Structure formats: C-alpha cells, structure tokens
Amino acid sequence: MSSALANLSVRLAGRQGVLVDINVLLDVATDYPVWAAWSGEALAQCAEFAPLVINPIIYAEVSVGFRTIEALNTALPGDTFTRCALPWEAGFLAGKCFLAYRRRGGERATPLPDFYIGAHAAIERLAILTRDDARYRTYFPKLEVLSPDR
C-alpha cells in the first residue's frame, strides 16, 4: 500500500465515516486487475478508523453488476457498510456544484450523481474513498479525499 492513505487516524479525526465511491466497490466486486488490490486494502484500512458508508445512489450504481438484490446485499452487507439516506442539503449543494461545472465547460455526460455523492460527503462530514478524485477536489475543496494520488 502506498503512502496515499498514510495518517488515516489523523485524516479521519472528526469525520462521521468514509463514503465509499462506486469505483472502489466495483474494483473489489469485479476483481479488477489494476485496482482490486489497492481498493481492497484501502477499504480495510479505512474500516479500522471509521464506519464505511454508502448511500442510495452508490447502491443503485453498484446494483447494475448484480443479478439479484440478495447478491448485491451479500456484496454490500449492512454490518460492513452503513447505509445513509441523502440529506436535502446535499441535493442543493450538488445542483450548485453541477451548475458551476457546466459553466466551466463541463460536458453533460458527467452525471449529476457524482456531484450528489460529493455533496453528501461534504454535508455529512464524511471523507470519501475514490479513485476519481479530481472532481471532488475541484468542487468540494474542504472534503477529505482518500485516493491513490493522495
């Protein structure tokens, strides 16, 4: 494991948990050759210091890789992943960040759900574990982003 997740106890102090982004979950679920080891180790390390959290958007996006809800729930067990509702404030913040993104020339192909995930983490004082850190760092600068690059 690289130093990307160094000092987790300090970085997660005061955080309510770690929101786990879709790409990390899919890396592990699909045993993605490039990232499965990093993502699995990152999940294990984060779980030592804070609850792992998912929300309905993450659950929905991960669900496309599973045939049944039972298989999905086995992959994302409730005793490992805390399931949090989305706060209304996160919807407002997501919309504002998405609008700023579009005004900067961002393509509509980038889905609003990515912004909703970042907003959820920001509003609820969660860190986010992701491999796609650029957008989170740009539009949610106070968010604690845990990624291979940092």
Regions found by a protein language model. Give the residues of each.
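Active-site neighborhoods of divalent-metal-dependent phosphate/nucleic-acid chemistry enzymes
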Residues: 2-5, 12-13, 82-127, 131
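Short, structured coil segments at secondary-structure junctions
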Residues: 79, 139-141
